[in-house]
Amino acid sequence: MSPNRWILLLIFYISYLMFGAAIYYHIEHGEEKISRAEQRKAQIAINEYLLEELGDKNTTTQDEILQRISDYCDKPVTLPPTYDDTPYTWTFYHAFFFAFTVCSTVGYGNISPTTFAGRMIMIAYSVIGIPVNGILFAGLGEYFGRTFEAIYRRYKKYKMSTDMHYVPPQLGLITTVVIALIPGIALFLLLPSWVFTYFENWPYSISLYYSYVTTTTIGFGDYVPTFGANQPKEFGGWFVVYQIFVIVWFIFSLGYLVMIMTFITRGLQSKKLAYLEQQLSSNLKATQNRIWSGVTKDVGYLRRMLNELYILKVKPVYTDVDIAYTLPRSNSCPDLSMYRVEPAPIPSRKRAFSVCADMVAAQREAGMVHANSDTELSKLDREKTFETAEAYRQTTDLLAKVVNALATVKPPPAEQEDAALYGGYHGFSDSQILASEWSFSTVNEFTSPRRPRARACSDFNLEAPRWQSERPLRSSHNEWTWSGDNQQIQEAFNQRYKGQQRANGAANSTMVHLEPDALEEQLKKQSPGAGRVKKFSMPDGLRRLFPFQKKRPSQDLERKLSVVSVPEGVISQQARSPLDYYSNTVTAASSQSYLRNGRGPPPPFESNGSLASGGGGLTNMGFQMEDGATPPSALGGGAYQRKAAAGKRRRESIYTQNQAPSARRGSMYPPTAHALAQMQMRRGSLATSGSGSAAMAAVAARRGSLFPATASASSLTSAPRRSSIFSVTSEKDMNVLEQTTIADLIRALEVVHTHAVLDEQQQAAAAGGAAGGGGISRGSRKQRKMGNAGLEPPQLPPILSLFAGDQTRTLQAAAANRLYARRSTIVGISPTGGAATAPAARSLLEPPPSYTERAANQSQITAGPSNAPTVQSKFRRRFSVRPTALQIPPGQAPPPGASLMEQSSQTALQRRLSLRPSPLARELSPTSPPGGSGSALPAGAIDESGGTSAQRLLPLPAGTRPSTSSTHSPLSRIVQISQAQRKSSMPSAAATGSSGAPAEK
């Protein structure tokens, strides 16, 4: 605080004291006048009474008696004088002194408020005066401290200037306080005591005592200056100076005391003292930890000593055997007889994985003896065990209490404690990581008491339950395969088996498997116009633009049934043979159920789709024909048959109602029967009348499949449909998921990817070839215009986009040729011809060509009279699959001496997938000049036809063709046989292609 600010604060403080003195003087001085008048009257009355009683005495005796009474009572009883010149106690100076003692918290107590108003005003007055007094004295102490330090620095400077060898001493806390106290004691205690002795007539010791009590704000109040009755008369004007001296001395002595306390506070904040404090606190904590750890260790020692000294010296007496040990069951399996009315017979135990069955049987015949452990304290009978311990009879109660305490303590498992401390591997303990490997309850789920396990896994030799509605789940499948969860696959078989049973029980009944809310909506919202066929369905994006459009009651149900296109009036197939539900083998006549997020199968309607079902999924029309079933129109009932009104009321896809997009888009699901009939009528009318677009008149070419299209009722008039993996009729083909390797799966994905990218280019090539050779001009599709996009390398779509029906998948001919130079497909491509032969040609498969490194002059093969520049392209495959040494899958090896052709363990799907060439091979893409579609091409040439031809690269001649056998595929032998057969039939294929007829590639 600056000196000016402190002076201003001092002026405010003195003014505040003057204000308080005026208030107290006004209140207490008037009250003192009244009290003194009353005392005068009382003194006169007492004097008259005493003189009346002492009337028989002489005057001297009366005066002596009155003086003794006055001295004893400390109040005069003599006759008061006519004029009383005794000074008042509550003068203005004394009122100021009282206010100062209140704010400085000294509180002598010689004078105090005598009225209620004075006491209340004192409380309010001290609330403001005490803080102001503290701030003032703190600033004064800071000023004294700076002055003291300045004097000390000046002294050191003087000493260093006069003595070059002078080194200032490093003063400690105690030395600094003592040095600061010396001038304070001399200035504020010793000298003022002489003044008090002179004016108050006190001894010096009392004056020094008063000075110390006042300076330290103790303020007993037994001695107070300036309150003598004769001091004003005796000292005159010096008494006024004395009164001012008392106030000034009081202020500065308190300020110096604050300075000393500040020095002590600074010393306590030094680094050395902080270090000492830290050391002390750390030692206290360490001592506490040592005490706690020592006590804990001692408790463990005490427990061990009790066990060794007392418990082991007596014979333990156990209680009755627990009822849990008498039950005929094991800890790893539940008690199957607890919920039965009659007790089940004790079954014979069948050991699952054990080599000691004979030993256990022998021990069982001899009788099992349960050995009680000495550590199982909960089974001890406390009274019977310790009552015979004569030497330790005094400790019986103590031992009983200790045993009870130790028996109730259940320490946590060590593994969980370690996992909680160290976190395990990625925060999981060993039991959590290996939870899927346990087929029985974990350690934490056992109930006490726990019997030691004598085996790994076991099961009861119970009679297998007769399942009436589903295939039993023989075990809890925790493992996963690349084809899905075994438990979900098992549940799928159960759902299909239920459908088989329902189909056999109610052949003529109609069963609708819908969601409960959807079925309720369908029953509630029946309307007369339900049989109306919706011609157009507004997409959701456009529907949001019209939020106030009225919503039909059956709209929600129609949207749920419009996921796939369902033909109207089609009846499901006949019931097939039952499943062998005690094995994992699926028969040829069985079907696969379809799971939707674990809810069960969808409605088992029939469709030309690819998912076959026998009451639990989609039904493939082709397999009905293969099984020898009657046509759909001849069947009278099935497991599921939708009503015509309900079937027509559902929402149809915009791709089945608008035939132009449907003709261009390769969809996974076929159009409905109603839309298909309209599309056929339009195509027939356009073909006969010769009007309309050629794209709408052409047959909608669908995306190629890995499997040949099955023969169905609509196969002659529509494009082939993709078959399902579960639609095969061979017993070996049903196990394709378990026998197909990862390499075969990758090759299959490559085939689908390549064929999907080149789908439209194959159609354009077929149409272009027909136009160049004088074929059909009206019925073929229009060729797309060549744009700038064909000059850049194409961006191949991902695998997932193959099933999205993306219509923006357009690649130009030049890009397709460059793509052919990099990839190849095993799917047969339709040659230049009309749309009538496209389905038959697209379903054929061809072996892969040979991949070899050829010279530049050998790769440039020309055909035809035109000489067009050729492009040489040489590339390397950018990816590969790690080869495997397994030529035949495990467990499928034929017997010795058997032929691979006769005894082949490969499925039909694997034989088709094996035709895919090895990704490790390399190919050189030769080119040929453009030519007509009817010109014969030599082996190894490509017909580009102006950049739009889709002709495949033929294998090299036998002399230059290397072997395509690869060790990375288990189907290499079948590939060699297929290539040999193709080599023998190559001349006929070339001759057929040269004549202009469709040739198989």
From Swiss-Prot:
<feature type="region of interest" description="Disordered">
    <location>
        <begin position="768"/>
        <end position="795"/>
    </location>
</feature>
<keyword id="KW-0633">Potassium transport</keyword>
<dbReference type="GO" id="GO:0042803">
    <property type="term" value="F:protein homodimerization activity"/>
</dbReference>
<feature type="compositionally biased region" description="Low complexity">
    <location>
        <begin position="984"/>
        <end position="1001"/>
    </location>
</feature>
<dbReference type="GO" id="GO:0015271">
    <property type="term" value="F:outward rectifier potassium channel activity"/>
</dbReference>
<dbReference type="GO" id="GO:0016020">
    <property type="term" value="C:membrane"/>
</dbReference>
<keyword id="KW-0812">Transmembrane</keyword>
<feature type="glycosylation site" description="N-linked (GlcNAc...) asparagine">
    <location>
        <position position="58"/>
    </location>
</feature>
<feature type="intramembrane region" description="Pore-forming; Name=Pore-forming 2">
    <location>
        <begin position="208"/>
        <end position="224"/>
    </location>
</feature>
<keyword id="KW-0630">Potassium</keyword>
<feature type="region of interest" description="Disordered">
    <location>
        <begin position="591"/>
        <end position="668"/>
    </location>
</feature>
<keyword id="KW-0472">Membrane</keyword>
<feature type="modified residue" description="Phosphoserine">
    <location>
        <position position="715"/>
    </location>
</feature>
<feature type="compositionally biased region" description="Polar residues">
    <location>
        <begin position="855"/>
        <end position="873"/>
    </location>
</feature>
<feature type="topological domain" description="Cytoplasmic">
    <location>
        <begin position="265"/>
        <end position="1001"/>
    </location>
</feature>
<feature type="region of interest" description="Disordered">
    <location>
        <begin position="830"/>
        <end position="1001"/>
    </location>
</feature>
<dbReference type="GO" id="GO:0005886">
    <property type="term" value="C:plasma membrane"/>
</dbReference>
<comment type="function">
    <text>Background potassium channel. Rectification is dependent on external potassium concentration. Acts as an outwardly rectifying channel but as external potassium levels increase, this is reversed.</text>
</comment>
<protein>
    <recommendedName>
        <fullName>Open rectifier potassium channel protein 1</fullName>
    </recommendedName>
</protein>
<feature type="modified residue" description="Phosphoserine">
    <location>
        <position position="565"/>
    </location>
</feature>
<keyword id="KW-1133">Transmembrane helix</keyword>
<keyword id="KW-0325">Glycoprotein</keyword>
<feature type="compositionally biased region" description="Low complexity">
    <location>
        <begin position="911"/>
        <end position="926"/>
    </location>
</feature>
<feature type="modified residue" description="Phosphoserine">
    <location>
        <position position="685"/>
    </location>
</feature>
<feature type="modified residue" description="Phosphoserine">
    <location>
        <position position="562"/>
    </location>
</feature>
<dbReference type="InterPro" id="IPR003280">
    <property type="entry name" value="2pore_dom_K_chnl"/>
</dbReference>
<feature type="modified residue" description="Phosphoserine">
    <location>
        <position position="332"/>
    </location>
</feature>
<feature type="intramembrane region" description="Pore-forming; Name=Pore-forming 1">
    <location>
        <begin position="95"/>
        <end position="111"/>
    </location>
</feature>
<dbReference type="Pfam" id="PF07885">
    <property type="entry name" value="Ion_trans_2"/>
</dbReference>
<feature type="topological domain" description="Cytoplasmic">
    <location>
        <begin position="141"/>
        <end position="170"/>
    </location>
</feature>
<feature type="topological domain" description="Cytoplasmic">
    <location>
        <begin position="1"/>
        <end position="6"/>
    </location>
</feature>
<feature type="transmembrane region" description="Helical">
    <location>
        <begin position="120"/>
        <end position="140"/>
    </location>
</feature>
<keyword id="KW-0813">Transport</keyword>
<feature type="modified residue" description="Phosphoserine">
    <location>
        <position position="373"/>
    </location>
</feature>
<dbReference type="InterPro" id="IPR013099">
    <property type="entry name" value="K_chnl_dom"/>
</dbReference>
<dbReference type="GO" id="GO:0034705">
    <property type="term" value="C:potassium channel complex"/>
</dbReference>
<keyword id="KW-0597">Phosphoprotein</keyword>
<feature type="transmembrane region" description="Helical">
    <location>
        <begin position="244"/>
        <end position="264"/>
    </location>
</feature>
<keyword id="KW-0406">Ion transport</keyword>
<dbReference type="GO" id="GO:0071805">
    <property type="term" value="P:potassium ion transmembrane transport"/>
</dbReference>
<feature type="transmembrane region" description="Helical">
    <location>
        <begin position="7"/>
        <end position="27"/>
    </location>
</feature>
<feature type="modified residue" description="Phosphoserine">
    <location>
        <position position="691"/>
    </location>
</feature>
